[in-house]
Amino acid sequence: MKNNFDENKTPVVAIWETTQACDVPSLEYDRVQPEADPLELNTLEALQLIDEVGELSPPIFVLTGADPLKREDIYELVQHASERGLHPFLALPATPLLTPAAIAELKHAGLSRLILNLDAANPELHDLVCGIHGSFDRTMEAIQWADHWKLPYQITTHFCERNLHELENLAALLQTFRIKQWNVAFPVPTTLDELEKTPSAGEFESAFVRLYTLAQRVSFKIKTSEAPHYRRYVLQQQAKERGGLQPQGHQVQEGIPGILPFNESRGTLFISHTGDVYPCSALHVMAGNVRVASVAEIYRSSQVFTLLRDPANLTGKCGLCAFKGVCGGSRARAYVLHGDMFTQDPSCIYRPTEQAAVRNSVPRTLPSEKVAIEEP
């Protein structure tokens, strides 16, 4: 991705929740219902939405939902997105609807990448974490089907207290696959019960150490969701390896293109099944609805997006931090836990006042694609 990409005009990632319908309850998707919401976007509205996203032309367009295969028009929608030049990704749970025939039809429709979930290298632990019995085995089968049809795929892991120890085991298992990318999704608690089960800031930091080490060893890209402060850790480690930070704006590694940092405060948008638009799926502050205004108008002009894109609005230690230009903290986590989407991210252990000397030395770009950045 080019460093001059203007995230004020075009999101890096656009995500559309196609449906909340799913035949199988899941611990990782709390909005599941057996049948489609009567208010979800119909086929004509969905096609119009894809046209509008196509005009924005984000590098990444992800179709997600409880189970997108519950939509009878999903193959038509994937094909339309492909024809619009959007290179669609599709996230699918391991339900009975995930079959060899479904994989084949998605490939034929022009799907660019399949996203599958794997929360542990151990079948029993994976099924326990995701809440779908037998999902580990079906995911393994889906990987084989994707390989057969030469459909690129990536794996998402939901990091939680139950699988804290599994990162190395998962990386070893994923090395045996032909995956393009491993995305480690960090939790945003929405209830007190979830908060008690959420890894601590120290455990986040420990995971960063391990992910950075693994990124040097594996053949696929490792990226993160809801952990923008992993970029801060990466920059700190690479500064140590170089013996000091380079001047602001300098490439972090010579000869490797910088990657634009993005999160819900900059460069992403999420569209719900009913057309409501949010900065991301975890930040429930609505910016508009596609039935009322265009996606471009909402993303470029709504108060929610324009305020979040300005790092000067950050408060607490995130506002003081030298790394706010490449991080910005999780605005969703700040909002859920503090009721303020501009305050500090409680999952970060970094204390910016201790590093005031580097405040003007942090680059805006990131290094190798082998190193994690934010992505769905």
What are these regions (language model features)?
Residues L27, E35, E40-T64, R71-E203:
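Radical SAM/AdoMet-radical enzyme domain recognition
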Residues T176, I271-S272:
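Short, acidic, Ser/Thr-enriched surface-loop or helix-capping motifs
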Residues Q48-A66, R309, Q344-P376:
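Short Fe-S-cluster ligation motifs
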Residues M1-E17, E55, E254, E374-P376:
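N-terminal [4Fe-4S]-dependent radical SAM core
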Residues D6-E45:
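Canonical Radical SAM [4Fe-4S] cluster-binding loop centered on the CxxxCxxC motif
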Residues F262-R266:
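Short, small/polar residue-rich loop motifs at catalytic or cofactor-binding pockets
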Residues E203-Q251, D276-G329, R333:
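C-terminal accessory region of radical SAM enzymes
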Residues R31-E40, H284-R291, K324-N360:
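Iron-sulfur (Fe-S) cluster-binding segments and ferredoxin-like electron-carrier domains
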